[in-house]
Amino acid sequence: MSKLIIAEKPSVAKSIASALGASSRADGFYEGSGLLISWCVGHLVSPMDAGGYDERFKKWRYDDLPILPEPFRYVLAPGKENAFENLRALMDRPDVDTIVNACDAGREGELIFRLVYEMAECRKPVLRLWISSMEDSAIREGFSDLRPGADYEALYQSALCRQKADWLVGINATRLFSVLYHRTLNVGRVQTPTLAMLAERDAKITLFHKEKYHLLRLTLDGAEAVSEKFTDPAEAEQAAAMCKGAAVTCTSVTKEQKKEQPPKLYDLTTLQREANRLFGYTAKQTLDYAQSLYEKKLLTYPRTDSRYLTSDMAETVSCVIHLAAKLPPFDGCTNFFPLVEAMISDKDVSDHHAIIPTMEIEKADIKALPLGERNLFLLVCCKLLCASAEPYMYEAVTATFDCGDHSFTAKGKRILAEGWREIDRIFRIFLKEKPVDGDGGTLPDFTEGQTFDGAEVSVTEHFTQPPKPYTEDTLLSAMENAGKDDIPDEAERKGLGTPATRAAIIEKLVAAGFVERNGKSLIPTKAGINLVTILPEPLTSPMLTAEWEQKLTEIAKGGADPDTFMDGILMMVQEIVSTYSCISEDGKKLFAPEKEVIGTCPRCGQPVYEGKKNFACSDRSCGFVLWKNDRFWTSRKKELTKKMATDLLKKGRTNVKGIWSEKKQATYDAAVILDDTGGKYINFKLEFPKRKVGADGRK
């Protein structure tokens, strides 16, 4: 008898087949060693669209809302019928007695497999392959420790709840507000509160009022001491005058030894954030690069929310660290003795451990990788080396001075042990990036009571700074914390989406026209801001959405009831539909298309706008309209263009070439003159160019 192994994509199936000795390639699967290995192509099975439940749902109408399928039905994804039929045929083979789910080890991978298994109506036993690396050794080890598929029932229920909740909120809210505002408005359970955070930040920037302030700067032995802020420039100048040339006394010197522990390893979100800061990569680009490196067996599983390793990995990671330390530019690090203990925490690893390089690093040609993958791979290597290095230790020095009855402060530091920052500095220099040294350079050796004569003082002007627009780096952080700042590293986070879905959420907002990229910044568009303005709090609140996400996590762990979760989603959808049945006239204008003014109405002086069929005065009571296909134009095989209409409104005439004469069966050129008598229809006259007089006096 044979086991059928189903992977999520062809490249993964190929790696599994190679590792397990299934070397014979057939049509749609590999075979060998008592195994059949095939693959999905992402989601083969999807929830049925609303129109599939009832013909009337194919049209978007308020009266049909809310649409609440019971039970949910599923269909094959368009274009993937052959892939599904191949899997169903393999499942039905009489020599197959067991199915192995080898889709990605996470919520979405579980859903991809289960929906195919259910639609194929397969009832054969299921085992689960759960691995965090595509290395041959990891695949073989995982296959020797297959777990019962039933162990992942809670994870499957969590995935189903996520999918159903997204469908219910997306279908009903999108149809509701699109019908009300006469424009397609895509509303999503997670993307809309993310948009709300962007809109809130944009509003803070718009409303920000900058304020001027001044600082006094005192120069002492090459060091600079700074005063408190002065909001009154005259007061600052007066203080500077008192200090210039006056004696300066050092009133205190404090020295404090400080220690910065090595950074933690990467989870997906922190990797995406740092890749955005250093390389400008979008969250999706980083995920794509990391996924490719995972499939090339160079990185461990990327869709993780853990920044720690498990205790059984200590020996392996120690070997990987020594291999990474041999790679340029890290081979220039000195006195490096890896400390693995700080990276180990079994309680902080649930499904997958932190992202690290694999043992394949020894055989890989890193220089041959595409630039994006190479940068990301070296970034992960750098983090692994930093995380296993000694702490960074320094002495923080603060010196205060008195001059002309004003206090000044100078800050500096003296490095005691560079520790992990040496590795970080070498990597940043390699990238031609400025090393992160923190505040303050080395101060002279000031002593309390020390005096200086003839103070040099300058006044500098400054302005308070507005909040900065979100970048993918800072937005990912906000999504992870549901917009709440100052959350301790060890606190339980209730975020928007998951590490695996946040990149797609950002891309959806951009694709829908609600967000634009401006360099590294993410800026909400007018349509995006208006959408957030009209939607109710349950759809825009980051904290409420994060609570839903937390409940999904609890369901996956077996700690919450799926039915209770779905009841809450259904209640929210029903309440939103019943609350919003009509909108004001002002509300309808929010999403009215912006019209270009092409001229001024000759009758009333109001703006004239272009419509689909005409150019009309914005004051409907005026009645002035230029029709694009007026009989005057169609009889002459012409259409009134925007340029022609602009000329008519500005100059009262427009020159037209190629006018058709039905009588002469030929074309001619002429000027068309606007002849408005104030009636319902506009009249036009033709004016022909005068012929030039020849030398003999003839025309």
Specify the residue positions occupied by each region the protein language model found:
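Metal- or metallocofactor-binding catalytic centers and their adjacent structured scaffolds
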Residues: P233-Y266, Q272
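C-terminal or mid-to-C-terminal helical accessory/interaction module adjacent to the motor/catalytic core
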Residues: F72, P94, D136-L220, K255-K259
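Flexible glycine-/small-residue-rich
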Residues: A7-E8, W39-V41, C103, V169, ...
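Conserved short loop/turn motifs at secondary-structure junctions
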Residues: M1-S2, A102-A105, H182-T184, K255-K264, ...
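Amphipathic alpha-helical transducer elements in NTP-driven molecular machines
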Residues: P10-A17, G34-V41, A77-R88, R93, ...
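Basic, low-complexity terminal or inter-domain segments flanking catalytic cores
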Residues: S2-L4, K80, M91, D97, ...
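Intrinsically disordered, low-complexity regulatory segments
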Residues: M1-Q163, P338, P466
